[in-house]
Amino acid sequence: MSDDFLWFEGIAFPNMGFRSETLRKVRDEFVIKDEDVIILTYPKSGTNWLIEILCLIHSNGDPKWIQSVPIWERSPWVETEMGYKLLSEEEGPRLFSSHLPIQLFPKSFFSSKAKVIYLMRNPRDVFVSGYFFWNSVKFVKKPKSWQQYFEWFCQGNVIYGSWFDHIHGWMPMREKKNFLLLSYEELKQDTRRTVEKICQFLGKTLEPEELNLILKNSSFQSMKENKMSNFSLLSVDFVEEKAQLLRKGISGDWKNHLTVAQAEAFDKLFQEKMTDLPRELFPWE
């Protein structure tokens, strides 16, 4: 088990699969192409679900690709050692993912036409999902208790830093033509309409039966049964034995876990931190 994080520019990262020098290269040297499509999220916000949907949009609903290539190769995380190497060698348009805050994201993006889809989620659910996820993997420092992780999360002393800072950093981009802001909650509530919105953003036309295939093959149950998407291929060096990295895939699970005192403290913190952003941005409020 790892007993500390890798720190880079004040942000915590796992100390397995990441290096400071690579993080610097990603920010300063990595070249984003105009044809690239990028999935941006804070961890535990529905990243893998969105990857699955985008892969299926690319294949018009045909599941062969998602059933034959691991999810981390179909849409590599650019900031990881493996992802940086894969993407640096890949020719043509690329699909890739990132959890990076805006100040560490590749500088080349801001003068490109590459399309970004930013998926956000109720931070209470992000917190709960993160607690179970980080306790299931071996490459990060683990909290001693639920309360300790709650304090870490509220302070931003967690992997990829503060949720509040991440949102604040990226939200000014939401009016740009090449930036699509989505929420996990709207994707869950009306998956069909949200997938149609993604297709419109990407300039992709689908037949009704292709859209139906995308919805079917990206369902939580389908992903849980697909060994290329459920992370069961990861070695025991990375995950605890019998860990389920796709846990529930629901909205509002925080109500089953947060104490009344924690919920009240979190509400107060949310109001303080997000007061300068329009409430309608957050469909869970």
From Swiss-Prot:
Its EC number is 2.8.2.2, 2.8.2.14. GO terms for cellular component: cytosol. 3'-phosphoadenylyl sulfate binds at residues 44-49, 121, 129, 184, 218, 223, 247-249. Predominanly expressed in liver. Detected also in adrenal gland and in jejunum. Gene3D superfamilies: P-loop containing nucleotide triphosphate hydrolases (3.40.50.300). The modification Phosphoserine is found at residue 251. It is found in: Cytoplasm, Cytosol. It catalyses: an alcohol + 3'-phosphoadenylyl sulfate = an alkyl sulfate + adenosine 3',5'-bisphosphate + H(+); 3beta-hydroxyandrost-5-en-17-one + 3'-phosphoadenylyl sulfate = dehydroepiandrosterone 3-sulfate + adenosine 3',5'-bisphosphate + H(+); taurolithocholate + 3'-phosphoadenylyl sulfate = taurolithocholate 3-sulfate + adenosine 3',5'-bisphosphate + H(+); lithocholate + 3'-phosphoadenylyl sulfate = lithocholate sulfate + adenosine 3',5'-bisphosphate + H(+). Disulfide bonds: none annotated. GO terms for biological process: bile acid catabolic process; cholesterol metabolic process; lipid catabolic process; steroid metabolic process. The keyword DNA-binding does not apply. InterPro entries: P-loop_NTPase, Sulfotransferase_dom. One of its GO terms (molecular function) is alcohol sulfotransferase activity. It holds the Pfam family Sulfotransfer_1. The active site is at 99 (proton acceptor). The keyword Lipid metabolism applies. Its main location: cytoplasm. Keywords: Bile acid catabolism, Cytoplasm, Lipid degradation, Lipid metabolism, Phosphoprotein, Steroid metabolism, Transferase. SUPFAM superfamilies: P-loop containing nucleoside triphosphate hydrolases. Sulfotransferase that utilizes 3'-phospho-5'-adenylyl sulfate (PAPS) as sulfonate donor to catalyze the sulfonation of steroids and bile acids in the liver and adrenal glands. Mediates the sulfation of a wide range of steroids and sterols, including pregnenolone, androsterone, DHEA, bile acids, cholesterol and as well many xenobiotics that contain alcohol and phenol functional groups. Sulfonation increases the water solubility of most compounds, and therefore their renal excretion, but it can also result in bioactivation to form active metabolites. Belongs to the sulfotransferase 1 family. Homodimer. This is Sulfotransferase 2A1. It comes from Macaca fascicularis.
